C-alpha cells in the first residue's frame, strides 16, 4: 500500500559528484548505501531538511480514504504529498517529454507534442466527446485495438458537486478517482452502461438540462452549493433517453470526499511553469489535481503532464 512508504531521498543529488563513475568496487557501493541510510536517519531530526525529486509529470495518483492521499509518481521514486503540507516546495521545469513518443518537443496539449496530439490513439477526440466512440461498431478512429480496450468496458454517467452540480462520464474502473480529480466533495452514479458510446449518448441528453463544466475557481475556494444529489439523480432519470432507462442505477449512494487542505484560497491565481521557470511556495492543500499554495497561488498539476520537473521540498 503506497502510504506505507516514505519518499526516497535522492542521494545522487545530495552528493555533488558523478557517483556512478566513482563506484569502482563493491566496497565503495556499500559505503554509498550506508551514506544513503545515514541521511534518511538524520532527516526526522531536522539535520537533513531537504528532499529532491525529478521526472516526467503525470497526473497525481490518489488513494481514497477518510482524507484523500495524493502521490506524485516518477520513474524511480514517488512523493506522498500529504506529508508535506505547510512546507516549502520549489518546482522548476527543465524540459519536456511527450507522454506518447517521449520526444523533447514542447508539449502541445494533454501531455502530448503537437504531432502525437493529432495522431496518437491516446488523444483521440472520442476521449473528450464519448458520443463519438465507434469501437462498438468495429470502426477505428486511430487504433481499433486500443479503442476497443478502453471503449468496450463498463462506463458510468454520474452527477458530482464540484461547487455546483455537474454531469459527467467515466469508466467504471475510475470510480471514485475521476470525482477526486475533479475536486468534487460528493458524487453519485446515475447509470452504468456496457460501453463508452451509450454512456456518451446519455451524457449528451443530460447536458441539455445540466452543466458538464467545473468552475475551477469556485471549486478551489470551496464554495459549495447546498444540494441534495439524490433528488438530482431522480430528476436526471426523467432526462435519460428511453432506450437507456434500463441502465439506471437504482441503488447508487452518494459518495463523500474529503481533501487534505489547511487553507483554501480567497482569490485563486493559476501558476504556469514552463521550461526554465521556477516557482516556490508553502503548500497549503491539495484538491482535484491542484496544488494550493500560500498567497492564493494554485498549480494545476495535471495541466503540466509531459513537463520535466525538479521538485525540492524543505521541511
Question: Where in the sequence are the language-model features?
Answer:
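Hydrophobic alpha-helical segments, principally membrane-spanning helices and signal/leader peptides
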Residues: 1-3, 28, 146, 270
Amino acid at each position: 500500500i503506497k502510504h506505507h512508504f516514505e519518499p526516497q531521498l535522492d542521494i545522487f543529488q545530495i552528493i555533488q559528484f558523478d557517483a556512478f563513475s566513482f563506484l569502482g568496487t563493491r566496497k565503495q557501493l556499500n559505503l554509498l548505501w550506508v551514506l544513503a541510510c545515514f541521511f534518511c536517519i538524520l532527516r526526522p531530526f531536522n539535520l537533513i531538511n531537504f528532499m529532491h525529486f525529478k521526472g516526467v509529470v503525470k497526473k497525481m495518483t490518489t488513494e481514497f480514504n477518510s482524507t484523500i492521499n495524493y502521490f506524485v509518481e516518477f520513474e524511480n521514486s514517488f512523493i506522498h504529498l500529504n506529508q508535506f503540507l505547510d512546507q516549502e516546495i520549489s518546482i522548476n521545469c527543465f524540459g519536456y517529454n511527450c507522454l506518447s513518443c517521449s520526444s523533447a518537443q514542447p508539449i502541445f496539449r494533454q501531455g502530448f507534442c503537437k504531432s502525437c496530439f493529432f495522431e496518437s490513439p491516446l488523444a483521440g477526440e472520442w476521449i473528450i466527446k464519448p458520443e463519438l466512440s465507434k469501437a462498438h461498431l468495429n470502426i477505428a478512429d486511430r487504433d481499433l485495438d486500443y479503442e476497443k480496450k478502453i471503449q468496450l468496458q463498463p462506463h458510468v454517467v454520474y452527477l458530482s458537486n464540484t461547487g455546483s452540480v455537474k454531469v459527467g462520464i467515466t469508466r467504471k474502473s475510475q470510480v471514485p478517482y475521476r470525482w477526486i480529480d475533479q475536486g468534487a466533495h460528493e458524487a453519485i452514479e446515475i447509470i452504468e452502461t456496457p460501453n463508452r458510446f451509450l454512456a456518451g449518448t446519455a451524457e449528451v441528453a443530460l447536458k441539455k438540462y445540466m452543466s458538464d463544466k467545473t468552475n475551477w475557481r469556485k471549486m478551489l475556494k470551496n464554495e459549495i452549493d447546498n444540494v441534495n444529489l439524490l433528488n438530482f439523480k431522480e430528476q436526471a432519470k426523467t432526462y435519460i433517453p428511453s432506450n437507456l432507462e434500463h441502465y439506471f442505477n437504482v441503488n447508487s449512494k452518494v459518495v463523500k470526499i474529503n481533501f487534505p487542505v489547511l487553507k483554501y484560497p480567497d482569490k485563486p491565481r493559476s501558476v504556469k511553469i514552463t521550461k526554465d521557470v521556477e516557482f516556490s511556495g508553502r503548500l497549503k492543500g491539495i484538491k482535484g489535481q491542484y496544488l494550493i499554495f500560500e498567497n492564493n497561488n494554485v498549480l494545476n498539476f495535471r495541466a503540466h503532464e509531459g513537463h520535466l520537473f525538479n521538485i525540492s521540498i524543505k521541511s
